[in-house]
Amino acid sequence: MRIWCLVWCLVIAVVSQSVVAQAGDAWLQFQGDALRSGNAAAAEVPSRLGLVGAVPLSDGIYTSPAVADGKVYAVDGSGVVWAIDAATLNVQWKFATRGGAGNCNNVSSPAIVGKYLHLGTMAGFYYVLDRHTGALVREIDCREAIFSSPAAGADRVYFATVGAQVYAVEPDGTVAWTWDFVKEVIGFDGDRWSGEAWLQARPDRVTWRDHFVCSRELCLIGKTLVIPAGGRTVFLDDAGSSAKLRVAGEIPAYDGKEFPATFGQSADSAGNVYVQWHRRDNAGRVEILKLNGDAVATDFVKGTQTAIHLPGLLSFASVSIRGDDVYRVRPEQGLGLCRHSAGQEQPQVLCPAPSICPPVIAREHVLYGGLDGKLYVVPLAEGEAQSLATAFEAPITAPVAVADGRIYVPSEDGYLYVFGEHGKAPLPTRDLNVKQARSPLAGRFSAAKFDWYTNYGNFGCTNANEQELRPPLRMRWVRRLEGTVKHLPVCGGGRLYTHTAEGQIIACEQDTGRLLWRRHFPDVYLSFTSPLYVNGKLLVPQAGIKQSRMRCLDAETGKLLWEAPFTGSPSWSRQFPPVVHGNIAIYASGSGTYAPQGTEKPFTFKGTPQESADGKEVMSWIYSNDNPYYPRDNRPLLWAWDLNTGKIVWEKDFSEYGRGGNDCGICIMDGKLYYSTFFGYSASHRARRGLPPENNGLTACIEPETGKVVWQSTKHYVTAKCTLTGRDGRLYIGGYNQANELSKDRFVWCLNAKDGSLIWQSDPITSALNAVSVGDRFIFSNALRGRGNVFDRETGKVVGGVDHNYACCRFTMSEPYILGANMDMIDLSAGSKLVSTGPAIDSRECLGAVVSNGRIFYTSQASGFIVSQTYGEDALNLPAVWNR
C-alpha cells in the first residue's frame, strides 16, 4: 500500500509539473492552460520571424497543437494524430483514430499529461496514447461526438461530449466519474438526439429551455469545472468519487431572456469566467461570471456589447486575459483584434485583420490567425503588426501554440506551419486538396434534380418538394459553426453551402458534414442572405453598409470568379439570392443611405432614432418590420448580370411608381421573371412627405433576357418579409404588413401569371412570412407569433393551421410535412400533427430544416451548429458515426 502511494504521488507530481510548465519550452494544452486564458507571459517571439517549415497532414487542421520535450503533437480534421520532431519536422509516429469518413471536422485539441496524450474525436471516442510511442493506452466509447478539448488539471483530466456528458479521468484514462447535464439540469432521461423521444416526454415542441448542446471549450479553475452547456454556464466541482453541481449560471436578460449560445469561454486565475454569448440577431457581449458561494455574480466587459442597432459584429472566439486586459477577435475588418482595458468604455484596436481564432498573448506580442490565412504578430506596445502568409490563403481558425521560440500554426489547408527565428523555408507548393469530397453523396435522391439549390428550394420559390420524407428521424452528423445565419441550407454538387451574416462562405460534404473550404470577404455586415448553387457556380449576395457585392465562386473550390456591386439592405427578410434564366443571373434590391441606427422610428427596429449629420433620411441597416413608407432615396431596382462574366446585361428602376425596393421578391416560372415589391401601406404619410402616393406596391412580369415589362399591376404586391411564389401558372403573394392603411387585415393573394389578375384572396390571416409554400397537395404560410395557415388551392379558404406559436420561423415543406425550428416535423395530412420535435440545438426559432437529396439539413440561427438527419429506411441504415 505504501509503495502504491509513493508511485501515485510521483504520478501526481509529474502531472502537476506538466500542467504548470508553461514556460517557453512547452505548450501542453489548448490556449496554454486549463483556464483557456491564452496568457503565455513566458513565451518569447523572435524579432526576425520566418517560415521554418510546413508539415503536411491528412486533412484540414481545426485543432491547436501541443508541444513538449522536442515533440509537436497535432490532430487533423480526419482524427489522425501526428507526433513531429520539433527540430527536424519529421513525423515520428501517427495514429489514426476510429470512425472512418464520418470521423471528420475534429476540433478537440490534444493535451499532454505527463507521458500521455489525451484527445477526443467526432466519432465519440476519447483516446489516451503513450505520447512517446503512439501506442494506445485507453479508448473510451462515449457514443457522442466530442467537441471540447481535454482540460488537464493537477491530477485529473476533464472533457465533455457535445450532448453535455462530462467525464473526469485519471492521467491513464481511467474514468473517475461522469455527470450528465441533460439528466441533472434539464431532467430528461430519454434519447437526447431523438425528436420522437422528446415528443413523448413533452406535451408540445421543444424550446430554448430544452437546449443542451456543449460545443465549445471547458475551463478548469482549481477543482471547479466550468461547462458551457445548453446556454448556461455550469460550475461543477470534482468531489473525488463524483461530481457536485454548484450552480447552473444564467446570462442576464439582454435582448431577450432565452438561454443563449456560448461562442467562446475562458477564465483567469482570479476565478472570473468570460463568456462570449449570443442570443439573437447580433445581440451579445462578453459576460463575466464568478462564483460567490453557490451563486453567480455577473458583469460584462465594456465595449463588447453588440446588437442589431449598434455598430459592430459579434465575436465567435474565446477571449484571452492578462491582468485586467481582455483580448478579443472579431470577423470584422478594422476591428480584428482589440484590447479591452479596465475602466475604458471602448477598446483599443491592435490589428484590423478579421478572425475567429482565439488569440495567444506572448511576453510582448499577441498572436492570432486570420480569416485571410495569415499569422498576425501584434506588439503589445507600440509598433507595426507583422503578418506572415501561408501558402493557399486558407483561414487559420484554431489557436497557435508557442514553444522554444517557435510558433506552430494550424491551417485549414492541411499544413502545420512552423515559424521561427531566421526561418527562410519556401512556402509549400503542393495543394493537399482538402477541398475535394471524400464521401460522395449516394442514394435514390442523390441526383441534381433533388437538390435544394437556393433558399426557397427552386427558382419558382415554391419552398416545397417531395422526397418520401417520413419518420423515424435519426442524426447523421453534427458540426460547429462560427457565425450566425438566417438563410436555409443550400445544396448542390454533393455539398452543403452556408453564408454567415458576418461574411464567411462555407462548403461541406452533404454526406458527412466534412469541411471542404471556407472563404471570408471583408465589409460584409449582417447580410442574412443565401447562396445559390447553379451550374457548378455559387452566387452569394454579400451586403454591407460600406459596400455590397454579388460574388460568384467556383462551388467546388471556393475560387472567386467575379464580383459586381449592388445597393440596398437585405435587412431581415430578403434572404433570396439571384434567380437564373439561361446565362443571366437576376437580383432585386433597393438603394439608399444606411447606418446601424436610422433617423426616424419607421426606419429603425429598436432604440432611439439618431439624426444624421447632414439632416438626410437614413435607414437602419436592419430596420422595422412595420413599414408605412420608405426613405426618399430608396429605389426599387433589378439587376441582371452575365453568369459567366458578371457584366451587366440590363438594369431596371421602378422608382417612378414608388419608393422602397428592399422588401421585394422574385421568381422564375415558364420562362418569365416575376417581381413584386412594397412601397409602404400609408398613402397619406407618403403624400405629406412628397413621395409618390398612388401605389402601395407593384408586381410585374418581365422578359428575363431583356428586362422588357410584359405586364405590371399596382393592385396586388408583397407587403414585406415575404417573397413571391410561382407554380402552375399562378403567383402567390403574402407579407407582414397590411396592404393599405384603411384595413389591418392581411391576406395571401393568388394571381393569374398571364396578366396579374386576381384568382383568389385568402381569408384574413395574421401574416404570411418568408414565402408561401406551394406543394402538390398543400399550400402553407407561417405567421409571426400567430397561427400558420393551410389554404384551399382553389378558393384560398383557410382549411387548417399550425398553433405552436412560432416566431419568424422559415418553414419549408417536404410533403406532407412542414419542417420548423429544431427540426420540428409537422404532418399537414394529419391535421398538422407534430410527429417529431428536437433535439433542441438552437435557442432561437428563425430557421426551419430542409430536405435535399434524401437527407434533412438544419442550421441553427443563433447557436453555431449545423446538423444532418436521415429518415425512413435510411434512418436505420445510415447512423451517425458515434451511434453504435
Where on the chain are the PLM-derived regions?
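Short loop/turn segments that connect beta-strands within beta-propeller blades
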Residues: 85-89, 130-134, 170-174, 237-241, ...
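Blade/loop signatures of beta-propeller domains
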Residues: 23-51, 190, 441-475
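Repeat-blade elements of multi-bladed beta-propeller folds
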Residues: 24-34, 58-82, 95-127, 139-167, ...
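A short beta-strand motif characteristic of beta-propeller blades
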Residues: 51-55, 90-99, 135-140, 175-179, ...
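Non-catalytic propeptide/linker segments at domain boundaries
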Residues: 427-442, 446-448
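Bacterial N-terminal signal peptides
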Residues: 5-17
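Sec/Tat signal peptide C-region and signal peptidase I cleavage site
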Residues: 19-21
